Amino acid sequence: MIKSIALERAAGNEFVPAEGNVGCEGLTPSEMILYAAGKAVGNDIIALLGSVAGRVMSLRITVEGSVVTRGKERSGTYREFLFRYDVVCSDPDDHSRISRAIELAHGKYCALVRMLKMIGPVAYDIYIHSGKDGKVGKEKETVTAN
């Protein structure tokens, strides 16, 4: 079974559940783990971007966790995780800096991502679009780290 939560960057660089997701009060404890990890890594990415963060028009983080259950159990144990980053920026020259900030957040700075890596593999996909409509230029990168 796959559990998933999506967050979007809002005013004040706050990460909130994306449209269609319930607020935090409606999340199960296991979904709260995904929410907390997405919010923590998002905060680290914004901090690492510095002045470039102002040129990021939107940042959506989707965190998925594969849950393994045994028998008739209602809850299970996470076995692996996938983070998906959908970024729209105003300047195509910022693509490499954005990718690097995501790499650093996953590989070095985010304590919650490091915690998830103790549970199982953590992979991430990066989709970066530039232009006002988000359709000019597109990069995809998939990284799996343990």
Please identify what each model-predicted range represents:
Residues 1-36, 43-146:
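Extended beta-strand/beta-hairpin segments
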